[in-house]
Amino acid sequence: MLVVPARLHRWPPEVQDLFGREGPLVLEIGFGDGRFTAELARSRPDWLVLGAEVSAASVLRALRRMRREGLANVRLYHGQGPFALRNLVLPGTLDQVIVNFPDPWPKKRHQERRLLREAFFRRLSTRLKPGGSLLLTTDHEEYFRFALEEAERTGLYRVEVRPPPEAHLRTKYALKWKEAGRAFFHAAFIKLREDPAPWPPLRRYDVAHALLSGELPQDLALEKTPVRLKEGVAVFLEVARGKEGFYVLTHVEEEDLTQDLLLEVRKSARGVYAGVSRFGSPLITEAVKGAVRALVDRLEAHGLEVVQDHT
């Protein structure tokens, strides 16, 4: 029921491989505690519902709910919606996207963090079927108007402003705002045409490591300052000494993907190994390779020399 992208053999996977059968595919971005997701899956057992949520606590609550209710037509992903859209959905296969009460990021300096921007609508068009749609429900009028303008700017959608369906007002936040007497806004963004720019899945790699000659340092002091990468940023958060060497807790951010993973520096039969630990099923991306390269640079500063480089 929980989708772990690193364990998928293919990106994006076939619907059959993800769900075990074919059917109309729906993506819910930001499912919270999963109560709307569960209601949707119960009411439309023929639908296949893929949910994306950034909160680990919410994902856990939703997983428990789906298992408790025995909902076999739901798959949940812990991470950002655009990542799921890009890497878990094949082009032209998505029937509907549902976005209920997204974070409005009301401050002007934070508006680039908003989900429903022009670039997102353009990319979404590559995944929706002809006539597929995105349904937005929000209590934030300014965000609602912003989303309408961003979609209309693409020329790829017909926008229909409608009363919100009752089911969309039974989410955790909707019930809270309803008690507070807030107004709600709802629109359907229906695909008319597709953006010509392709949106291929994120490139991933099997390995990211290097072999070095020299002695393993007695100490590996790594500053907690951001390492700027071409694809994003990495921060070495903490170093722990083990029997064979060091483990480095590393935070890596890139477009639509944030990972906390372990890098390791240890003795091997052929020298000193520096690379990604497989603990936690990390995704080896260009940014992760860049983080390993930055770690190797620190080791070179300790006098080690690279003899094999797969970063």
Swiss-Prot record:
PROSITE patterns: SAM_MT_TRMB. Its EC number is 2.1.1.33. The keyword Protein transport does not apply. It comes from the Bacteria. CDD domains: AdoMet_MTases (cd02440). The active site is at residue 103. It is an enzyme of class 2 (transferase). It holds the Pfam family Methyltransf_4. GO terms for molecular function: tRNA (guanine(46)-N7)-methyltransferase activity. Keywords: Methyltransferase, S-adenosyl-L-methionine, Transferase, tRNA processing. It catalyses: guanosine(46) in tRNA + S-adenosyl-L-methionine = N(7)-methylguanosine(46) in tRNA + S-adenosyl-L-homocysteine. Pathway: tRNA modification; N(7)-methylguanine-tRNA biosynthesis. Substrate binds at residues 107, 139. SUPFAM superfamilies: S-adenosyl-L-methionine-dependent methyltransferases. GO terms for cellular component: tRNA methyltransferase complex. S-adenosyl-L-methionine binds at residues 28, 53, 103. Belongs to the class I-like SAM-binding methyltransferase superfamily. TrmB family. Catalyzes the formation of N(7)-methylguanine at position 46 (m7G46) in tRNA. This is tRNA (guanine-N(7)-)-methyltransferase. It comes from Thermus thermophilus (strain ATCC 27634 / DSM 579 / HB8). The lineage of its organism: Bacteria, Thermotogati, Deinococcota, Deinococci, Thermales.
